[in-house]
Amino acid sequence: GVASSDATNMQATAVLDGDEYVINGEKWWTSGAGDPRCKILVFMAVTNPEAAKHQRHSMMLVPMESEGIEIQKMMHVFGYDDAPHGHAHIKFNNVRIPKDNLLLGEGRGFEIAQGRLGPGRIHHCMRTIGVGERAIELMCKRGIDPSKTPFGKNIASLGANFDYIA
């Protein structure tokens, strides 16, 4: 496999054979694949290895029940499995899909991925900032809670707690 987050460095292939693409390769961190409601995968593969670096890949829809799809294992992130949604390591062995399952056209996979990843990254950053702000809010609230007064003082005034909040 390829140990990289460089989307242009993938090895999974989709080769046109008549009216079908034949998919071979592996995908790690396939989000949502563990969820029993997941019926279709959005799959990016090399369709033209001779094309320019950012035009080699195509995006296609792959039904989960397709013959040749094998979930190898579910992945953990910092010990958390995100069940049942999860992230999977999947092998694709001669998986055949109709050529009509191609999205936007051959060579446009990288373009599609970048169009989705940019806004997705902003979304995750905003969510994380929001969670951080909420944690600080709860910490401050607890620090001055009149019902929490060990040694007769509020928690914020004890030890380094005020510094931690700052």
Regions found by a protein language model. Give the residues of each.
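Structural beta-strand/beta-sheet cores of well-ordered domains, especially the beta-sheet scaffolds
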Residues: 10-12, 39-41, 57-58, 67, ...
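Short glycine/proline-enriched turns and hinge-like loops at secondary-structure junctions
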Residues: 5-8, 33-38, 52-56, 82-84, ...
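Glycine-rich beta->alpha junctions and the first turn(s) of the following alpha-helix
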Residues: 70-166
